[in-house]
């Protein structure tokens, strides 16, 4: 798929997607093939920073100590300082935090304490602070660039089933913006598959309520 093909697909989607009383998400659906998920090298897990946000604001949390507290407080949506970690040994409170938060930024020198407190809750939900997304940072780091980057970042994850469904845009974005995000995600996916395009069975683009439009790849 090149950028022109991506734009053509978006145009086709516009033709079939009916207007609703709400702004619909636009999802990329990829069916994979010839992958053995028992092999670690066949498990798909990476992050893509798209050219544009998907249109949905990401809720960003920070797990820090005094070194980053003021910086995190000025940038992130919720900040849990080290001295409050014990409060989140309450499973209900920890689960509520995990549910509302898309990404967690963590201070690197307290990762052991973060893992001990939050690992059992965030780990199964794939929300532990992840170095692959740049979410584990040194003390005194400026967080605004990372916060802005995470607003455009999605996780591509397939460990058990050979299908991906990723929210890459909203219908109120321009065709060019949607196409740029589509191309960026697909291009990165191809380069993370062991057999590249040969691991792709089919690709579709759809809005929340529309029928899927096939992408020729």
Briefly describe each language-model feature range.
Residues 64, 168-170, 207-209, 217:
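Flexible glycine-/small-residue-rich
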Residues 20-25, 192-204:
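Flexible, glycine/charged-enriched surface loops at secondary-structure junctions
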Residues 8-16:
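Interdomain regulatory linker/hinge segments that flank or connect interaction modules
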Residues 72, 123, 205:
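Residue-level signature of catalytic and energy-coupling elements of molecular machines
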Residues 16-70, 90-91:
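Translation machinery proteins
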Residues 82-184, 188:
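Long, charge-patterned amphipathic alpha-helical coiled-coil/hairpin "stalk" segments used as oligomerization
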Residues 27, 58-61, 78, 102-105, ...:
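Structural motif
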Residues 75-81:
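Active-site regions of enzymes building and remodeling cell-envelope glycoconjugates
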């Amino acid at each position: 798929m090149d950028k022109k093909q991506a734009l053509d697909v978006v145009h086709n989607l516009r033709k079939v997607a009916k207007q609703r009383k709400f702004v619909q998400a636009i999802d990329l659906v990829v069916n994979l093939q010839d992958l053995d998920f028992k092999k670690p090298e066949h498990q798909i897990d990476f992050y893509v920073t798209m050219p544009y946000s998907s249109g949905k604001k990401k809720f960003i949390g920070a797990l820090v100590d005094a070194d980053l507290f003021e910086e995190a407080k000025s940038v992130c949506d919720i900040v849990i300082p080290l001295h409050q970690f014990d409060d989140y040994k309450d499973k209900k409170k920890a689960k509520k935090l995990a549910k509302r938060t898309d990404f967690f930024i963590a201070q690197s020198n307290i990762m052991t304490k973060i893992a001990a407190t939050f690992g059992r809750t965030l780990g199964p939900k794939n929300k532990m602070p992840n170095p692959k997304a740049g979410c584990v940072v040194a003390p005194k780091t400026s967080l605004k660039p990372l916060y802005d980057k995470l607003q455009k970042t999605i996780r591509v994850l397939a460990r058990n089933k050979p299908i991906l469904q990723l929210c890459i845009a909203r219908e109120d974005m321009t065709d060019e913006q949607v196409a740029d995000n589509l191309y960026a995600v697909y291009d990165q996916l191809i380069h993370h598959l062991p057999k590249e395009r040969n691991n792709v069975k089919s690709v579709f683009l759809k809005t929340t309520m529309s029928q899927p439009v096939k992408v020729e790849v």
